[in-house]
Amino acid sequence: MKLSRFLLATFLTCVFPTHAQQVWIEAESFTNLGGWVLDTQFIEVMGSPYLMAHGMGKQVKNAETEITITEPGTYTVWVRTKNWVAPFDAEGAPGKFQLSVNGQPLEKVLGTEGKDWLWEKAGHAELNGSAKLALVDQTGFDGRVDAVLLTRDASFNPPNELAATNTLRRRLLGLPEKAPETKSYDLVVVGGGYSGMGAAISGARQGLSVAFIQNRPVLGGNGSSEVQVWAMGGTRRGLYPHLGEIVEEFADRSSNSPAADPAEFNDKLKEEAVKGEKSMDLFLNTHVYGVEMAKDAKKIRSVIGLDTKTGKETRFVGQFFVDCTGHGSVGALAGAEFMMEEKGHMGMSNMWVLKKTDQAVTWPTTPWALPLELEDFPAPRAMEPVGVKNKLNMTGFDLGYTPTPNMEEYLHGEWFWESGFDKQPLKDLELVRDHNFRAVYGAFSALKSKGGEKYTNYDMQWLAYIGGPRESRRIVGDMILNGEDMVKGLIHPDGCVPTTWDQDLHYPKEQYAVKFPNNPFISRAEFGKHTDRKNGYPVPYRCFYSKDIGNLFMAGRTISVERQALGSTRVMRTCGMMGEVVGKAAWICVRHHTSPRGVYEQYLDILKDLMNQPGAMRRDTLEGALYLPANAKKLPEVASDGLDPKKMPGIIIDDEDAELTGDWKKGEGLKPYVGSHYSFSSAKGASARFAFAVKESGRYEVRAYWQPHENRGKSVPVSILSTDGEKTVTANQSKPAGKEGYQTLGTFTFKAGEESAVIFRTDGSQGNVHLDAIQVISAK
């Protein structure tokens, strides 16, 4: 059996007579968490889930529990905690709290010591029989608690070293050496993000018995309400246009990322989609921390998980396993070869939301946060009304939520609040998250103290305490896909999942990296070579299983790709389609007694046939025939990335018909666009002339189409040449052109047959000039 050396324990409030002088209480086992949240992200880093007072500057309600003491007496009370800003040599201790016993706070204020997790002596208490414990937050700034230890031995000092702490934990909790096991499942899926959901649902619809394991209380991973990254990537296209149909049954239709209301990410819909599969067992709040290998082969026999709320340990036995953890955790525990950049990788984001209230809101001083000036970070942006962003993923679908009124009252810090580029992508994750906290709190402090009246009435409504990582381990398969194959369009015989996202890697944004060069917290997206956005590049099946472990699949950002390719494949709708393919391949493995590699070598035609079937198709048994249920969810047609100029009224001059001067690049990333692409440039002296002639003299409205981006020009000069003469207006292309994708440049007089034009220039634009299309329509 292989276990993470940092692990762990059953999380029970319990007393054992054989160790009556010492009582261990896991914070996670408190019966009422109050306003404290359960953090499970860093179990491999610090040894346990823990509770955190994430009140964003407002004290949270007490976490409470009751224990029974069998030996009365005077107990020394220890609490395992951390001053979370101390590793940064920051001033103060923001996460202060106390432990209350029977309504009486102990003398020591906790969360103030050390640079790592350690035991702080909270005080002493006279205990006899029943005792009520409470964690009393003092600040709302992320105080954290792993465990409480009571001892009658006044000379006992619990160990701070992690391995010794966990040895003590296991001894005092009386953990069995071997956890009980489940029945044997056909497929065990570990990780409940989009890739895991795709694999679990797809496998269940093929008649497999599926154990679906997720270490959070909700499904969706980065696409859940806890993280609020909207799911990107084109589905239902390419070689196998039915791939993605399962994903679209549960994908979000959010208006913003993050949104004014986290409910836009529709956790309920995701759970309903999973629970609708009768052959699947869902295990939420279960963290996999170990594997048990088969004795006679390099295969996994079971994965070992613990319930992060009740502490129950379980071995999940299966024939085949899917690593959808995002970190390649199962593969690494099993000994699979993997790739990982220790430095120079993409970071982790913790996004945030502000809301304007009807009165002034005070904000505490934060001397421990990053000392920021207004120019040290991008100001949070106003949210857009429903339908301006993410429109393609909304078209034809039930949104699944009621749009938030008064959207203009919300501001948000988006995906680019990202750090950890040169930090170890696994061991340093808690430090990365906490650095993000310091950046966000420091930014809000700057807005409050230096932003004038604009931010007086704003309050912090939401800050993700669960981070959204982008890159860590990638398990090596029989093929490592490189980015150049995508660009060249090299199609492999097992190409299947269409990846449509351009090769998008993140780096520190130089403008904001000057003050904190060792750990920048604002990123920029660098788009490399383009992929075929219309049809997608088909990612090979051989990237979806381990070359070393005979029964291990993977799906999501942990598949077998090099970094440039990862920049394209990592987005969530694409990851979900990988899961769909893996679920089908797992059925072939079970039904035909083969391996993931054997599917490619012997049964590829069967896999191709399955990928050509609608996602709603299912079979009731392993041997049963596929059929389409009468109640199968009907999906709307795929919304086009581009607007068809032939279907638009008036005169349409697309960017490909414009007369371009200077260096212009083509793009497809900002959707929707008119025609097959758009063009953009910031080259000095570049220009674009959209020439046209009307058939009838008269007054015409002139419209310019574009999609916004932060790097687009804020003052783009646009000249309209008409019978009235030349008029120049400026366009802010960093903002949306309008709900319909265009901005009216004005109404002008044009003479029939006379050449007129709209001219864009880069000089003075303050960013990239975006060319999509000009529309000239009668003003009658």
Label each PLM-derived region with a short phrase.
Residues 21-176, 641-780:
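Extracytoplasmic
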Residues 176-181, 297-302, 312-320, 324-643:
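Flavin (FAD/FMN)-binding glycine-rich loop and adjacent Rossmann-like elements that form
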Residues 208-209, 214-294, 339, 346-349, ...:
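Conserved N-terminal/central alpha/beta ligand/cofactor-binding core
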Residues 181-193:
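Beta1/beta-strand and adjacent pyrophosphate-binding region of the FAD-binding site
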Residues 2-9:
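Sec-dependent signal peptide recognition
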Residues 196:
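N-terminal Rossmann-fold NAD(P) dinucleotide-binding loop
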Residues 16-20:
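Sec/Tat signal peptide C-region and signal peptidase I cleavage site
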Residues 203:
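Aromatic pocket-lining residues of Rossmann-like dinucleotide-binding sites
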